């Protein structure tokens, strides 16, 4: 993923109040610091890690309030809304990242004719 491929798409989310998820460069940098890679963060959330879900949500909200803590964000999540939050995180991440165009392994060589 090239930095210029990141799309800043805001996804509305209802938590303690109406907010927006935004995975911008700063959010991705925070996730890289916490997990080593965005893939690791997403895989942990998909595996059901509440800590990963909380951290992803926190990173997506930092654009609104840089002083927001993970514990404060955790208080916005409940058992009744966690699934919807995970769906919205997935939607926001998908919107922010470029479409996968395949890897070099899957590329077809041009016909030399």
Regions found by a protein language model. Give the residues of each.
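Short, isolated positions in well-ordered beta-strands
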Residues: 19-21
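Charged interaction scaffolds used for protein-protein
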Residues: 1-10, 17, 29, 33-51, ...
